[in-house]
Amino acid sequence: MPNSDAGLVSVLMSVYNGAPTLEKAAASVLTQTYRDLELILCDDASTDDTWRIMQRIAAQDARATIFQNKTNLGLGASLNECLARAQGAYIARQDADDVSDSDRIERTMDFLLSSGAPYAACGVRVFDDTGVWSTRQFPQKITKHIIAQKNPFFHPTMLFRRAVLESVNGYSTSPETRRTEDYDLVMRLAANGVIGENLQEILYSVYEPQEAYLRHNARTRMYEVRVRARGLRAMGSPASDYIYLVKPFIMACVPRGMMRSVKRLQWKLQSRDTKK
């Protein structure tokens, strides 16, 4: 039987112009085998039918709570607003264009409780309009050295003990973290000695169309350098780990038309390294 007596899980979802995929994403949460959950939906000032769809979802399932931002606040601030409304002792994530496997929350919760980890994530399969084109996993055990290289947790799969998330006051709302809210959070937690673990199962499907790689520009890459540098200092990382600050500079120089090929090669190498 699903471990529903472990406690209420609040699933946070911030949506901006997510009308085409929102219902499917929400349904993948509300049909979980783990039944003791609620879905907190934030419409981050969308200009499409997102709010109307949210109203329909809430009318059909009392476990869905919905609200609107008057202006577009961005992911970090919107998730903090979701957290303020959440009732659960555990906090999970979900993105509006992704799909959770039906047992994702149950299996991740079981792993979280059995491992004693402060938070947990799982592996993902990556799809676009042509179908699944990649799978990704990170090692179960994570160190500060690994975090210095990259964010080793897939943000929309993360499940936190609420106290862990609140110990660092949730997500940063700084403009510098607008594309790196998750990495910033992981680094701030690691600076406090709090590092999660990865369940070695693929339980989540991430939608990544080719245009997803165009969201980062030179400015966001420079912001990423600042976030990384601040995180390295906070974690007390050795000087040798600062070499990884070069990565955002390199990515900023890659022609946009080549980005997907570069990312695919990166994920292939990452998958090979993970299996070692």
Regions found by a protein language model. Name each.
Residues 50, 78-79, 100-105, 130-131:
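Acidic donor-diphosphate engagement hotspot in glycosyltransferases and nucleotidyltransferases
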Residues 21-23, 48-56, 99, 103:
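Acidic helix N-cap motif at the loop->helix transition within catalytic regions
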Residues 69-86, 107:
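Glycine-rich, basic loop-to-helix element that forms the pyrophosphate-binding segment
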Residues 43-52, 71, 95:
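A conserved acidic beta->alpha catalytic loop
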